[in-house]
Amino acid sequence: TAFAHLATLMADGTPQITPVWVDFDGVHVLVNSKVGRLKNANMAERPAVAIEISDPANTYRYVSVRGKVVAVERDGAREHLVALSQRYRGEPYPWWSAGEEREIFKILPERVVTRVIEE
């Protein structure tokens, strides 16, 4: 499963890019993050984001999404991360911190671009 790169906006307007695991609920792109991360603060203050996912087997095949964070949920966030870890790593999530809290950011796509160039 391909990693995504999430672009959020810093207070000065510069982008901050983070590799993330992503999910899709049929409407929203879902990003799971540990509470207190810089990307969380950026999305809370400035909900416009961009995400790009490239196919590791052909990096000229990708999907790019621009959208807005429309909801943040903590309920079920730990279980969601466990499921993401199974999909991305094939095993339980190994990096829990004591008292760790997680959030799921729901991103509503506003523009989606796909590209496929066969090598």
Predicted regions and their residues:
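Short secondary-structure boundary segments
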Residues: 34, 55-56, 109-110
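Charged, gly/pro-rich active-site loop segments
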Residues: 60-119
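Short beta-strand segments
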Residues: 2-35, 41-43, 49-53, 64
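A generic "cationic amphipathic patch" detector
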Residues: 19, 26, 56, 80-82, ...
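A short beta-turn/loop motif at secondary-structure boundaries
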Residues: 12-14, 55-59, 98-99
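Alpha-helix boundary/capping residues
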Residues: 1, 46-47, 84-88
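Generic internal hydrophobic packing segments that stabilize the cores of diverse globular domains
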Residues: 40, 46, 78-81
